[in-house]
């Protein structure tokens, strides 16, 4: 057996991709055992540090923001460590000539660097022994610390190997120019660098391939504008022994920094795998490669040869040609007739099931609405109040797609009429909102329900009219009057009181799921009234958390809710925390690419918290109240949902009757762990090939 066949071909495959797999890849996956792979998205199993954040729709990871504000560096790591070194005892049994055996590895990723308007330092693929350390900006790409003694102490036990995609010339760091690729082996001073053959700052997707062959002690890097055609010749080829830097387990991921520039560093697609451990009891058993072949169509290292087996029995003599033709004819005829019969059954069955589904949904809606009691006003009254639902009376659109009209009832009361179509998701939103409002009828900080009605094609909710619009418009309308601090503080306190009521005091717990400034209405006295319960869910006290498709508005959604779809009171608390920071700072959750959470937390770490106050207030606020709102906001957006306070505690902290919760100087990393299930990946010691795919 050739020596190459004695190596284990594949230990670990990690794939993060935002594009559909090819048909060939899909068929190979389908043939693999169900337990040998799982699919994840960018929103799962990642640790985000510094300025790193998920792109809308979890379409990738932004490592930096296109601004000079904030941390300036970001890092995204796969949360589960990867085995890269065989321990000494196992290595000794496999090969007496070496104390430890490193793995070979390869990775492919598609990235995009967009100047805004200037470029930053660049980004890097890295392997690191620390999941929580984030290095410096200003040329260091978030990989290594600056030269301060405190940072050096923090780095003492951290091992890092990185491939730089460098877009900034820093003479002090021995950079050759402002457009190069380089290898860092334990230090920011690169051991090798080269021209990439592409313009790294072009703002277009670029694909990089990195491959390290441990037996040859060589690392190669290719770059191309094409995501599928790897160049024949590598841009960088470095002879380097990484065994002294690799640890038994390390974390794979990306890091970037902006330094004195401002650019958006995005990774859109990522594949990673290790291979090359000698066959031993400590390494996983050989398995088939179940992912797509490498884009350059280079074969993977072959698996070990199978053990000899007895020869198969001699085949029977071939049939006569006429028999073969007749047999083939019957096969084709049977296949055609069988296909036609099957198609007919599918069409008939689909029609029957569709009819049943429609009838069942209509029946379910009728039952749901009937359970809520009789309508409190007629559809004719609702139509008359809005002048026949005249488009000139439209004042907004609800998050569930319902249209909101201003109207006047026969009594002269001004109302907001929310009109749903009696189809699909609109019906569900109507039922959810009506059920929530009937379960929590009385609270001064909820928009009061004045009535409701239904017909065959329309569903209507009627609320008291809020003459001062919503909090979003009051905060962010250009050229308008600045909302004074007294009204802002009262709004934050009012929304906190409303959420505490929904979570703890209603007959059933109500999870709002869409707390944001545009859903906070302002009455005639600028009192805050929380509204729009179209996404709300009702759960009995002590009942299990809700698992749903994540819904709401990006920027306000808790990271664990985006990842798991499990809606709890703590996900509402996170949304409230973002709202509190928005009200105090006058900034939207994400403005010009800057997260208000990251920005305020950075100022808190620099002991400049009150500097986050909205400049339009011109200092006209109570400093203690401003500080209290900002700190309450930060503790509510803690990445670990278990460390967020309940809304009752939030109310007490805001009114000063409870002490503030201690907030760490640095924002803790966002640890997005997978939901445990039977198909979760086994430990690294015993896992077969693992396949990860993001769609």
UniProtKB/Swiss-Prot annotation:
Q: Where is the composition biased (Pro residues)?
A: 286-320
The keyword Protease is assigned to this record: no
Show where the Protein kinase domain sits: 389-661
Positions of region (Legume-lectin like): 37-276
Result of knocking out the encoding gene: Male sterility due to aborted pollen grains with abnormal exine an intine, and defective aperture. Aborted pollen grains with defective apertures and intine formation, and male sterility.
Looking up CDD domains in the UniProt record yields:
lectin_legume_LecRK_Arcelin_ConA
Give me the glycosylation sites of this protein.
45, 279
Catalytic-site annotation from UniProt: 514 (proton acceptor)
Q: Which reaction does it catalyse?
A: L-seryl-[protein] + ATP = O-phospho-L-seryl-[protein] + ADP + H(+); L-threonyl-[protein] + ATP = O-phospho-L-threonyl-[protein] + ADP + H(+)
Q: Where in the cell is it found?
A: Cell membrane; Cytoplasm, Cytosol
This protein's major location comes to membrane
- Description of post-translational modifications: Autophosphorylated at Thr-376; Ser-378; Thr-386; Thr-403 and Thr-657.
Question: Where are the bilayer-spanning segments?
Answer: 332-352
Q: Which residues carry this modification: Phosphothreonine?
A: 376, 386, 403, 657
Q: Where is the signal peptide?
A: 1-23
Q: Which GO MF terms does the UniProt record name?
A: ATP binding; carbohydrate binding; kinase activity; protein serine/threonine kinase activity
| Family as reported in the entry's similarity comment | In the N-terminal section; belongs to the leguminous lectin family.
Protein function: Legume-lectin receptor-like kinase required for normal pollen development and male fertility. Regulates pollen exine assembly and aperture development. Plays a critical role in annulus formation, and may participate in the formation of the fibrillar-granular layer underneath the operculum. May function by regulating the expression of genes involved in pollen exine development. Kinase activity is required for its function in pollen development.
Please state what the protein is called: L-type lectin-domain containing receptor kinase S.7
């Amino acid at each position: 057996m050739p020596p190459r066949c004695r190596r284990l071909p594949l230990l670990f495959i990690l794939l993060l991709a935002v594009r559909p797999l090819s048909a060939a890849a899909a068929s190979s996956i389908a043939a693999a055992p169900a337990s040998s792979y799982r699919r994840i998205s960018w929103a799962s199993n990642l640790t985000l540090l510094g300025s790193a954040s998920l792109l809308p729709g979890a379409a990738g990871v932004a490592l930096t923001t296109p601004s000079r504000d904030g941390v300036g560096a970001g890092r995204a790591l796969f949360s589960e460590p990867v085995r890269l070194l065989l321990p000494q005892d196992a290595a000794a049994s496999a090969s007496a000539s070496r104390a430890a055996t490193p793995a070979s590895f390869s990775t492919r990723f598609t990235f995009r660097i967009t100047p805004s308007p200037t470029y930053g330092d660049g980004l890097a693929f890295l392997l690191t022994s620390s999941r929580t350390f984030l290095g410096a900006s200003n040329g260091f790409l978030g990989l290594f610390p600056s030269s301060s003694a405190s940072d050096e102490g923090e780095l003492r036990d951290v091992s890092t190997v990185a491939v730089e995609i460098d877009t900034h010339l820093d003479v002090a760091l021995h950079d050759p120019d402002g457009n190069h690729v380089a290898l860092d082996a334990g230090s920011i001073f690169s051991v090798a660098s080269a021209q990439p053959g592409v313009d790294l700052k072009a703002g277009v997707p670029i694909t990089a391939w990195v491959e390290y062959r441990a037996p040859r002690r060589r690392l190669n890097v290719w770059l191309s504008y094409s995501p599928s055609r790897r160049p024949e010749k590598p841009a960088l080829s470095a002879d380097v022994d990484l065994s002294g830097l690799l640890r038994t387990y390390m974390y794979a991921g990306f890091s970037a920094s902006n330094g004195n520039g401002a650019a958006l560093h995005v990774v859109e697609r990522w594949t990673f795998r290790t291979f090359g451990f000698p066959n031993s009891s400590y390494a996983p058993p050989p398995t088939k490669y179940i992912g797509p072949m490498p884009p350059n169509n280079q074969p993977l290292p072959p698996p070990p040869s199978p053990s000899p087996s007895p020869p198969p029995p001699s085949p029977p003599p071939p049939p006569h040609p006429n028999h073969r033709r007749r047999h083939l004819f019957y096969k084709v005829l049977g296949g055609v007739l069988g296909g036609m019969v099957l198609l007919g059954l599918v069409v008939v069955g689909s029609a029957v099931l569709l009819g049943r589904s429609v009838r069942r949904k209509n029946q379910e809606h009728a039952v749901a609405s009937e359970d809520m009691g009789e309508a409190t006003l007629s559809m004719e009254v609702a139509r008359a109040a809005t002048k026949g639902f005249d488009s000139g009376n439209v004042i907004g659109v609800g998050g569930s797609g319902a249209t909101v009209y201003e109207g006047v009832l026969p009594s002269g009361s001004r109302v907001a009429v929310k009109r749903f179509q009696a189809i699909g998701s609109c019906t569900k939103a109507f039922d959810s909102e009506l059920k929530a409002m009937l379960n929590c009828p009385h609270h001064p900080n909820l928009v009061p329900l004045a009535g409701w009605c239904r017909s065959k094609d329309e569903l209507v909710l009627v609320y008291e009219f809020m003459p001062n619009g919503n909090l979003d418009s009051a905060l962010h309308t250009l050229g308008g009057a600045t909302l004074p601090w007294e009204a802002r503080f009262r709004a934050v306190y009012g929304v906190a009181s409303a959420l505490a009521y929904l979570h703890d005091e209603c007959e059933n717990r109500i999870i709002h799921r869409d707390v944001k400034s545009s859903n906070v209405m302002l009455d005639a006295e600028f009192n805050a009234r929380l509204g729009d319960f179209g996404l709300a869910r009702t759960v009995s006290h002590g009942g299990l958390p809700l698992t749903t498709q994540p819904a709401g508005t990006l920027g306000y959604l808790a990271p664990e809710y985006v990842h798991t779809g499990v809606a709890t009171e703590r996900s509402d608390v996170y949304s409230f925390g973002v709202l509190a920071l928005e009200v105090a700072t006058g900034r939207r959750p994400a403005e010009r690419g800057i997260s208000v959470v990251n920005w305020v937390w950075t100022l808190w770490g620099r002991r400049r918290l009150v500097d986050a106050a909205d400049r339009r207030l011109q200092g006209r606020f109570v400093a203690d109240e401003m500080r209290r709102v900002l700190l309450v906001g930060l503790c509510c957006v803690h990445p670990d949902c278990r460390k967020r306070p309940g809304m009752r505690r939030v109310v007490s902290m805001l009114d000063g009757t409870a002490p503030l919760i201690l907030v760490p100087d640095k924002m803790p990393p966002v640890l997005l762990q997978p939901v445990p299930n039977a198909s979760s990946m086994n430990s690294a010691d015993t896992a077969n090939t693992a396949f990860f795919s993001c769609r």
